[in-house]
Amino acid sequence: MANELPTNVSYGTVTGRYLLAYADSSDVGLNPDGIAAGGEILFTPLVERLRDATSTPPVTIIPKQVACTINVDGYLCGPDGLSSVRLLATDDADLDVVGWLWQVTYLLTDVEGSLIRGIPTHTMSLPGGTTVDLITIAPVAGLVG
């Protein structure tokens, strides 16, 4: 049985959508087709433990890696299946470490299930009570050529 974390712990929400651009198929339109990527995105906390001395009773929180999938429409889905994921906030003043980061690793696949490159691993902060769209914070790809 899962226990709730203390009520003074803050969270943020992460969203994102990932489509692969393929040549136009035999559909009605003439434009390239957008097909949902597959695979997963991993969120790894870059902190070993967080002490919440202000909760009753005090508690040590050990953040764990969170694996999210990409649904059939290309949206990031948390372990609960919803089109977003709630993670521990990195700026919670009730915890003894403020300003830690999440590492974001993209393991996206194409329609054949092969890993695709394109979005490098990066870090992110997640302020409490906010929604962060990964599309707006992922590193911009350089030109190839």
PLM features: what roles do these ranges have?
Residues A2-H122:
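Beta-strand-dominated extracellular/periplasmic modules and repeats
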Residues A2-E4, M124-G145:
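Extracellular beta-sheet/turn segments enriched in Thr/Pro/Gly and aliphatic residues
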